[in-house]
């Protein structure tokens, strides 16, 4: 460990989590851009294509809690690196199905399901990293950077995949995305460590700052089992599942994240196709305007993370985590309802993009709250929460075209707007200072710190 200087290793690693987050969305959204070409090549209907989209999300949802528990037990370095390799393999396999293959639908569903299973580790692992490496006062911005990768990856996907489709065919986009993933995962494995104390480049000053931000100075038990300093092979003490499933806070944020996932995945799964097929924009114009929601997400994640930290420091976590999230999600519902009524395709794209941005203002609240209340079990608890998100996402992938076919696309967006208001209301019952760890309160409003572990 370097002691002669002050380092910022934690932020360098957060930046690489941003890269991995972007790559994960590059690998999951590419099929929504290539979906039209795939549907034409294999004679798939929109409903069948929706099943392919949903398959990834079902696999992603089913393995959230498993991925989170693995990160809790074995650390974010190994688990995340293994996940990147896994999903890189199945991204590449998406491109190998033979032309005119009669079992193409089954093949695509199976491969995308397994891709989702591998991607399930990314955000629970990132949240476990944040619980170990990032002080409470910085968690909003750190999560903002991680999820800004969603906007960056999803925003890069339409022009990149469209260009490759035009010049090299749809299969090339999956090969390129796979190679990018392998590279990003290898770099993560080389530069990351599970704890700050185990990283050779972390200075004494940075380590002390991290440790003081993760624990309550007046709690002796916290300082003895701080995950930032415990040895790599030390036993990990986790919150029992029975305490997780009895928590009102966990169920409230999971319900809200279910609604969030339903709404967000309209943009990831169907927005490009909606602009091209329903609004009548050409391929290149659709690619440009379909970038707008994702660019809005990128900016909103960073802005939301900054607001999260500042409001929490100013008035406590109820304002910084809960009220901010409720306001942002409700605002998203207003934008989406208005955007669905706009006649101009281009203006509708801008208004709907505003809805996507407003939705992502709340992103840091979900993940910062679970890190705050769960500490060493943040991977498991955030994985449980994210399961709700992915169930919502899987439902929207096939339900959105079904609603559109029977009632029109305006109805599809209005359903999403209603769910925004349900998701916003869910935050009103959350107590952000109710720790899942027995015997520990979370006086964040007073101290700016939260305990991250306890003997169970």
Feature names for model-found ranges:
Residues 111-151:
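Cytoplasmic helix-loop-helix junction between adjacent transmembrane helices
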Residues 150-199:
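Helix-loop-helix hairpin linking two adjacent transmembrane segments in secondary transporters
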Residues 301, 371-406:
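A late C-terminal transmembrane helix in Major Facilitator Superfamily
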Residues 31-33, 242-302, 363, 367, ...:
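Extracytoplasmic gate region of multi-pass secondary transporters
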Residues 54-69, 291-304:
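Central cavity-lining transmembrane alpha-helices of secondary-active solute carriers
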Residues 318-366:
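C-terminal transmembrane helical hairpin of 12-TM major facilitator-type secondary transporters
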Residues 85-102, 330-343:
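C-terminal ends and interior cores of transmembrane alpha-helices
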Residues 90, 104-121, 335, 346-361:
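Hydrophobic core of transmembrane alpha-helices in multi-pass small-molecule transporters
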């Amino acid at each position: 460990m370097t002691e002669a200087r002050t380092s910022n290793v934690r932020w360098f690693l957060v930046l690489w989590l941003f890269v991995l987050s972007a790559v994960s969305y590059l690998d999951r959204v590419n099929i929504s851009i290539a979906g039209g070409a795939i549907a034409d090549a294999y004679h798939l209907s929109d409903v069948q294509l929706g099943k392919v989209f949903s398959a990834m999300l079902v696999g992603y949802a089913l393995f959230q809690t498993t991925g989170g528990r693995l990160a809790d037990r074995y650390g974010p370095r190994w688990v995340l690196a293994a996940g990147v390799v896994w999903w890189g393999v199945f991204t590449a396999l998406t491109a190998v199905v033979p032309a005119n293959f009669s079992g193409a639908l089954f093949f695509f569903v199976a491969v995308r399901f397994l891709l989702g299973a591998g991607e399930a580790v990314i955000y629970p692992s990132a949240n476990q990293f944040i619980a170990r490496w990032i002080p409470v006062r910085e968690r909003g911005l750190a999560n903002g950077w991680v999820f800004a990768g969603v906007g960056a990856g999803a925003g890069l996907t339409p022009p990149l995949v469209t260009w490759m489709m035009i010049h090299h065919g749809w299969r090339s986009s999956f090969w390129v995305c796979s190679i990018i993933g392998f590279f990003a995962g290898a770099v993560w494995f080389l530069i990351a460590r599970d704890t700050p104390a185990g990283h050779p480049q972390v200075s004494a000053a940075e380590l002390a700052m991290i440790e003081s931000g993760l624990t309550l100075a007046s709690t002796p038990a916290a300082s003895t089992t701080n995950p930032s300093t415990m040895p790599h092979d030390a036993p990990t003490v986790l919150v029992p599942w029975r305490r997780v499933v009895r928590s009102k806070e966990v169920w409230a944020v999971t319900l809200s994240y279910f609604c969030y996932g339903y709404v967000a995945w309209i943009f990831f799964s169907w927005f490009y196709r909606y602009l091209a097929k329903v609004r009548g924009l050409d391929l290149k114009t659709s690619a440009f305007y379909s970038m707008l929601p994702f660019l809005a997400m990128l900016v909103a994640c960073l802005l939301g993370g900054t607001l999260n930290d500042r409001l929490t420091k100013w008035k406590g976590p109820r304002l910084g985590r809960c009220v901010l999230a409720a306001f942002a999600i409700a605002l998203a519902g207003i934008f989406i309802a208005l955007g669905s009524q706009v006649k101009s395709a281009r203006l509708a794209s801008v208004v709907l993009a505003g809805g996507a941005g407003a939705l992502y203002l709340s992103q840091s609240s979900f993940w910062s709250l679970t890190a705050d209340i769960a500490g060493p079990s943040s991977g498991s608890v955030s994985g449980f929460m994210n399961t709700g998100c992915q169930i919502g996402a899987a439902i929207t992938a096939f339900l959105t075209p079904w609603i559109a076919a029977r009632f029109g696309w305006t109805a599809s967006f209005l359903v999403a707007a209603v769910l925004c208001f349900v998701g916003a209301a869910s935050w009103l019952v959350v107590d952000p200072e109710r720790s899942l760890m027995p015997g520990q309160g979370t006086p964040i409003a007073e101290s700016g710190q939260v305990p991250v572990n306890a003997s169970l």
